[in-house]
């Protein structure tokens, strides 16, 4: 199979995006200045979809080892094999840390995976999701039905639009939890890592409300993590913690999360008080594959080099 950059749908944005991805004879490779000197490649069996939305290039391909793969602007977003490690952790780390969450907002997450996980919590009455790119939602429903199954939940309200603008219009104290499933801090997603955005989240949360946001890799992005931690400690007057999980197809094989709470009822993220089990949620959803209470607690254990840096930002 011979496929070039032009045919993978990435060429139109090459000047706009610093990512350099390609499908060469039988292989997809992802390269970025965020992880210089290395690349991650997956063998391609078949390209299933290529399209260009108003915001980005979208591609789906069948890999030989990780099932179907969703790629946005040349960056792997999820694979069928390991998406559970990300979706389950970014969702249940916050929601299992507070009693009876009722209103949840998801920023990004157009593939529907976070929605699927939120729907496991029977106490939740309202799930709002704000995704900027309608094509991502449509592609996920067509090619990743086991991920996008969350959209079938009647508690879900989908808003197509900019998450930053959406948050600015949310009445103060609306949500028990906000989950930010963002891409890397390049281009439009840069706003989702900056102080004004975190301030908007804090305003939208009730006292003792929680936020979980994608927070990069300790192996590649400590300088970004330092800034995120510093901003969060200024804004969130409850708890501020960094946790992580393993995702083989993400750069360095892991990804982190910032877990923060607003001033109010104390939140101890490291000790889940609202546990779920393998059978939680609608019958249309498969049992948990990754998350459990033990891995919840373990996810906050950091290697010494990262622990020193993160703790120093709290002084």
Swiss-Prot record:
This is Spermidine synthase 1. GO terms for biological process: spermidine biosynthetic process. The active site is at residue 181. SUPFAM superfamilies: S-adenosyl-L-methionine-dependent methyltransferases (SSF53335). Residues 25-262 form the PABS domain. Pathway: Amine and polyamine biosynthesis; spermidine biosynthesis; spermidine from putrescine: step 1/1. GO terms for cellular component: cytosol. It holds the Pfam family Spermine_synt_N. It comes from Hyoscyamus niger (Black henbane). Putrescine binds at residues 86, 181-184, 250. Keywords: Polyamine biosynthesis, Spermidine biosynthesis, Transferase. Belongs to the spermidine/spermine synthase family. It is an enzyme of class 2 (transferase). Its EC number is 2.5.1.16. CDD domains: AdoMet_MTases. GO terms for molecular function: spermidine synthase activity. It comes from the Eukaryota. S-adenosyl 3-(methylsulfanyl)propylamine binds at residues 56, 87, 111, 131, 162-163, 181. It catalyses: S-adenosyl 3-(methylsulfanyl)propylamine + putrescine = S-methyl-5'-thioadenosine + spermidine + H(+).
């Amino acid at each position: 199979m011979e496929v070039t950059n032009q045919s993978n749908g990435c060429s139109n944005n090459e000047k706009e995006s610093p990512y350099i991805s390609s499908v060469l004879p039988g292989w997809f490779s992802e390269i970025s200045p965020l992880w210089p000197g290395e690349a991650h490649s997956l063998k391609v069996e078949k390209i299933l979809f290529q399209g260009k939305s108003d915001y980005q290039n979208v591609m789906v391909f069948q890999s030989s080892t990780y099932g179907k793969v969703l790629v946005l602007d040349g960056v792997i977003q999820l694979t069928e094999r390991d998406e559970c490690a990300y979706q389950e952790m970014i969702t249940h780390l916050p929601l299992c840390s507070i009693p009876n969450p009722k209103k949840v907002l998801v920023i990004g997450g157009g593939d529907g995976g976070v929605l699927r996980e939120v729907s496991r919590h029977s106490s939740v009455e309202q799930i709002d999701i704000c995704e900027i790119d309608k094509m991502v939602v449509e592609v996920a429903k067509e090619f990743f039905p086991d991920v996008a199954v969350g959209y079938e939940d009647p508690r879900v309200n989908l808003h197509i639009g900019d998450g930053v603008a959406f948050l600015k219009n949310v009445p103060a104290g609306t949500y028990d939890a906000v989950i930010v499933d963002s891409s890397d801090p390049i281009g439009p997603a840069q706003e989702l890592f900056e102080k004004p955005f975190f301030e908007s989240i804090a305003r939208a949360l009730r006292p003792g409300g929680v936020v979980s946001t994608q927070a990069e890799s300790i192996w590649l992005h400590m300088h970004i993590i330092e800034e995120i931690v510093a901003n969060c400690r200024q804004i969130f007057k409850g708890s501020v913690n960094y946790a992580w999980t393993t995702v083989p197809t993400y750069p360095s094989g892991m990804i982190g999360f910032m877990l923060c709470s607003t001033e109010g009822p104390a939140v101890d993220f490291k000790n889940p008080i609202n546990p779920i089990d393998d059978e939680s949620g609608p019958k249309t959803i498969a049992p948990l594959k990754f998350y459990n209470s033990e891995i919840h607690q373990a996810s906050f254990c950091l290697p010494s080099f990262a622990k020193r840096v993160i703790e120093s930002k709290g002084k």
